Every structure is written in structure tokens, then in C-alpha cells.
């Protein structure tokens, strides 16, 4: 079987067991290719995380491909039909951990850049790559640290295309032009432990907190807008008790998350939660963790360039969406960059037997190359 450039590079990347935060030479493989076509290569290691900043050109505007080489753990190896780090093609599908999320997109970015530079050696502005091995993990020493470094030296990204698997039913049918914010909390409600037969001598934190939790679940936080659905509140964990059937627990711990729109701020959500908990007279502590601000890229140069490229290559009228979880776009958008996520189908990401359609790889490369043409061709 004749492998295209994108498929060949995908296979090479997929053979690397780069479980987060280990890069396992993926960035070196990419950097070697990029260096040959004139990119200045700058590895940036923070803690146990490898990052790559590669740039061709010194002027603006700057078009940046962003993505991650790390993958999630494989899960039970005996549940896979083939070794997750020995990629296989079966029935037109490429199987391997990271095939959809997101090593095939990384390969497409590199090949698209090689082809574009060959046609336009004196292109406008700059092309850059921002690649990390810490997207699937804590995301503390990855993209956010690279962005901080670039900001300190006043290096600005104009347009950023993140290669996350955005497509749903066919390649390019969905691109993400924003993401909701994510706010987490751990709530600890204090009670008084006692015997279930003597409730008057105890305080049951489950009973005391239940009305407040019910109100939090029923609250309408906002109604969303044309770009974002309404803010969502979800309880993810509840723990209380000793395991015994005759002991009233002394404390309750609840973990919850907001996925929130641009109609409300994290501070407003915190304030309303405290008001509800205080109204119910709870004795509590709460620890907040803001893991991502919401961002939105309105229709403009980058969105137009992507929609035009997708239509030309696939014939698909793409839909803009802000659904799904967080991505590293949340660290790039606050710098003022236009950010868009565009990649392969996401149906099997993080799953056993993760795979992608082989016939999508070359069209994805063509889309990426056309976006470069639309923005940086002289």
C-alpha cells in the first residue's frame, strides 16, 4: 500500500508511547521536518513537560498551528484489537492511541506547512507551531507556560488553528470557534457525627445540605446566547459516612462543575453559590478551581479562511460550535489571537480501539494548506 506523506508521518508519531506528560520524541520528529523547510526550532521544557515553539518568519501576522503530542492512557491492553502503539490499518481505518486525538492532525499540519512553503517560500508574515506534551494532564507546564514566555518577549499570535478532533459525522462538518468556561468546586459541609437512633444528638450534613444542593441543581444561571448554550451545573461526586448503617456522618463532601457561557463570570457564579449555601444556614468550606475562561472567535479572517477551505476541499458547509470540553485554546485566546479548532472525527477519542478514517487524512492536509493559502499567500 502506498502511504501518503500525512499517513506515513502519522504512523511514525503513533508508534511513540507518549502517554501524558511524556513526549517520547514526537516533537523531535516534527521539529526535524520543520527545520528542513526553514523553521527556527525552540524546545521549551518546563518541569516534566516538553514543549515546542517553531517559527518560520520574523514578521507579522503570525499563523500558528497548535496541538499536543501526549495521549491518554490506553486502558486495558487486552481490550484492544491491536497494540495501541503499533498502529494498524484495517478496513480503511487507522487504529492506535492518539489516532484521532490528535497525532494525525499534527502530521497534517507538518505536511501542509511543507507544501505551502515549497509553493510560497516568501510568504507573508510567519508560520508557527506551538506543541505540548501536557494537554491531557494537568496542563500546568504546557501551552500556558509557552504563551507566558511569548508574551514576555512581545511575540504575538494573530491566528491560531488547534488541531483538536472537532468533526462529528464527516470531516469539517463542525469547527469550534469558542469554548465554555470551566469552574470546579469542592464543597465540605460540617455536621455532627452520631447514632442514627439518636438524631437529636447529631447533625446530619446530608439532610442539611440536600435542600441547598437541590436549589443549585434547579437554578437557571443564564439563558446562553447565540454562540453558547445556557450555563450548566453538574454534581460529579458526593461522599459522606463511614460505611456503617448506624452512624450519622459528621461531614459531607461534594464536587461540582460549571460549564459556563459568556453571559456570566466565574465571580458571579461563586457569589450566587455562596448566597444559596448561606441562605440554607450551612456550616461549610468551599475550594474553587477555575480551569478555563470562556472564549469566542467571531466570524472574521480565520473563520472565513477555514470555512472557505473546508467547502473547497470537501464540499461541506461547516457549522460553528462552542460545545464540548476545554482545550488549550483557552490559554491562547486571552492574548487576543483568533482561535479555531479543526480536526478529524471525534467519535472514538479516549476510547479502546481509537481510530480515524484513513481517507480523511489527505483532505485534512489539503484544508490546512488552503487555510495557509487564504491567509499568508503573497
UniProtKB/Swiss-Prot annotation:
Catalyses which reaction(s): N-succinyl-(2S,6S)-2,6-diaminopimelate + H2O = (2S,6S)-2,6-diaminopimelate + succinate
Functional pathway: Amino-acid biosynthesis; L-lysine biosynthesis via DAP pathway; LL-2,6-diaminopimelate from (S)-tetrahydrodipicolinate (succinylase route): step 3/3
Superkingdom, natural source: Bacteria
Essential cofactor(s): Zn(2+); Co(2+)
Keyword Zinc carried by entry: yes
Residue numbers binding Zn(2+) 1: 68, 101, 164
Gene Ontology terms, MF aspect: acetylornithine deacetylase activity; cobalt ion binding; succinyl-diaminopimelate desuccinylase activity; zinc ion binding
EC number(s) recorded for this UniProt protein: 3.5.1.18
Active-site annotation: 70, 135
Keywords assigned by UniProt, alphabetized: Amino-acid biosynthesis, Cobalt, Diaminopimelate biosynthesis, Hydrolase, Lysine biosynthesis, Metal-binding, Zinc
Keyword Cell inner membrane in annotation: no
GO BP annotations listed: diaminopimelate biosynthetic process; L-arginine biosynthetic process; lysine biosynthetic process via diaminopimelate
UniProt cofactor note: Binds 2 Zn(2+) or Co(2+) ions per subunit.
Binding site for Zn(2+) 2: 101, 136, 350
Function summary: Catalyzes the hydrolysis of N-succinyl-L,L-diaminopimelic acid (SDAP), forming succinate and LL-2,6-diaminopimelate (DAP), an intermediate involved in the bacterial biosynthesis of lysine and meso-diaminopimelic acid, an essential component of bacterial cell walls.
Family under the similarity heading: Belongs to the peptidase M20A family. DapE subfamily.
NCBIfam families per the UniProt record, alphabetical: dapE_proteo, PRK13009.1
Cross-referenced PANTHER family: ACETYLORNITHINE DEACETYLASE, N-ACETYL-L-CITRULLINE DEACETYLASE
Subunit composition and interactions: Homodimer.
Name of the protein: Succinyl-diaminopimelate desuccinylase
Organism expressing this protein natively: Acinetobacter baumannii (strain ATCC 17978 / DSM 105126 / CIP 53.77 / LMG 1025 / NCDC KC755 / 5377)
Amino acid at each position: 500500500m502506498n502511504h501518503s506523506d500525512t499517513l506515513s508521518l502519522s504512523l511514525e508519531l503513533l508508534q511513540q508511547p507518549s502517554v501524558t506528560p511524556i513526549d517520547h520524541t514526537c516533537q523531535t520528529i516534527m521539529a526535524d521536518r520543520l527545520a528542513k523547510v526553514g523553521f527556527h526550532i525552540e524546545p521549551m521544557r518546563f518541569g516534566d513537560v516538553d514543549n515546542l515553539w517553531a517559527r518560520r518568519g520574523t514578521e507579522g501576522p503570525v499563523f500558528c498551528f497548535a496541538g499536543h503530542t501526549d495521549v491518554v492512557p490506553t486502558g486495558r491492553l487486552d481490550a484492544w484489537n491491536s497494540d495501541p502503539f503499533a498502529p494498524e490499518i484495517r478496513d480503511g481505518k487507522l487504529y492506535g492511541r492518539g489516532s484521532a486525538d490528535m497525532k494525525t492532525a499534527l502530521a497534517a499540519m507538518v505536511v501542509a506547512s511543507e507544501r505551502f512553503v515549497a509553493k510560497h517560500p516568501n510568504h507573508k508574515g510567519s508560520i508557527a507551531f506551538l506543541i505540548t506534551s501536557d494537554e491531557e494532564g494537568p496542563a500546568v507546564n504546557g501551552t500556558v507556560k509557552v504563551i507566558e514566555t511569548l508574551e514576555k518577549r512581545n511575540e504575538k499570535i494573530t491566528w491560531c488553528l488547534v488541531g483538536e478532533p472537532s468533526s462529528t459525522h464527516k470531516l469539517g462538518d463542525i469547527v469550534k470557534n469558542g469554548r465554555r468556561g470551566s469552574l470546579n468546586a469542592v464543597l465540605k459541609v460540617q455536621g455532627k457525627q452520631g447514632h442514627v437512633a439518636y438524631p437529636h444528638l447529631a447533625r446530619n450534613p446530608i439532610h442539611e445540605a440536600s435542600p441547598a444542593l437541590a436549589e443549585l441543581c434547579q437554578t437557571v444561571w443564564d439563558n446562553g446566547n447565540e454562540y453558547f448554550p445556557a450555563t450548566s451545573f453538574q454534581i460529579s461526586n458526593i461522599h459522606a459516612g463511614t460505611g456503617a448503617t448506624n452512624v450519622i456522618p459528621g461531614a459531607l463532601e461534594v464536587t461540582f462543575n460549571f460549564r459556563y457561557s459568556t453571559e456570566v463570570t466565574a465571580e458571579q457564579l461563586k457569589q450566587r453559590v455562596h448566597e444559596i449555601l448561606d441562605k440554607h444556614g450551612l456550616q461549610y468550606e468551599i475550594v474553587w478551581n477555575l480551569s478555563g475562561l470562556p472564549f469566542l472567535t467571531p466570524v472574521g479572517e480565520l473563520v472565513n479562511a477555514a470555512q472557505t477551505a473546508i467547502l473547497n476541499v470537501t464540499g461541506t458547509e461547516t457549522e460553528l460550535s462552542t460545545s464540548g470540553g476545554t482545550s488549550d485554546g483557552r490559554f491562547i485566546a486571552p492574548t487576543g489571537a483568533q482561535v479555531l479548532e479543526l480536526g478529524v472525527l471525534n467519535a472514538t477519542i479516549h476510547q479502546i480501539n481509537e481510530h480515524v478514517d484513513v481517507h480523511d487524512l489527505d483532505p485534512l492536509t489539503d484544508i490546512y494548506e488552503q487555510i495557509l493559502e487564504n491567509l499568508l499567500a503573497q
